[in-house]
Amino acid sequence: IMPSLVGSEMCIRDREENIPFFGVFGACSTFVESMILGSIAVEGFANNVLCATSSHFCSAEKQFRFPLELGNQRPPSSQWTVTGSGAAILSKNGTGPYITHVTPGKIVDMGIKDANNMGAAMAPAFNDTLITHFLDTGRSPSYYDAIISGDLGHIGKEIAIDLAKSQGYNIKSNYNDCGVLIFDKNSQDTHSGGSGCGCCLSLIHISEPTRLGMIS
């Protein structure tokens, strides 16, 4: 994540406008964390907040796994860091879509020790956050046209569905994951799917039907 923060700092530094800057260190959750903090700022005193992040495959391999030159084998449970970037502007004024609720997640550690199976490690926290959101809002999964997680990947997605079902919530029909959607499993060998700060951002166009009123 350090290379992403350094790149963001250099981008902001070289602008003529000297705008305030927060460097958010959140790994796969960076964009959503930025949106949560940005929406709180807009609700309070900010007029416009730009939320942006990025990730890069080779940088992530070097930083968190092994340099590509080593030629290490990747287990089937591993995921492929997305080389991608994107941004969203939150504003006090506009026609939407709106951020109406935010539910920050808690640390949920189920004791997963395999560093190559991040989907299994992250799925319990996603499930806890989702159910907390349902309880806080009084809503059920059927209220939403789409429930989309950031980068649990193929393995994490199935675990999340099973965990929700074990607690009485059926999310199978309207739930998907950006790590599953970003790559074509049949033609691209990315094992358990995509991951990284740029994973969900690269699929931000999913929100376009919301703006057009196609989904609510």
Regions found by a protein language model. Give the residues of each.
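Single conserved hydrophobic/aromatic residue that forms the stacking wall/gate
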Residues: 1-7, 11, 204-215
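Conserved beta-ketoacyl condensing-enzyme motif
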Residues: 7-26, 143-158
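A glycine- and small-aliphatic-rich helix-loop capping segment at beta-alpha/alpha-beta transitions
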Residues: 9-19, 41-43, 64-73, 164-169
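A short glycine/serine-rich beta->alpha loop
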Residues: 19-26, 72-77, 111-117, 187-196
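Active-site-proximal alpha-helical scaffold in enzymes
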Residues: 24-52, 90, 194-207
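Acidic, glycine-rich active-site loops and adjacent beta-strand->loop/helix elements
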Residues: 28-29, 53-59, 105
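Condensing-enzyme catalytic core mediating Claisen C-C bond formation in acyl metabolism
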Residues: 67-131, 136-139, 172-184, 211, ...
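Internal helical hairpin/lid segments
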Residues: 147-203
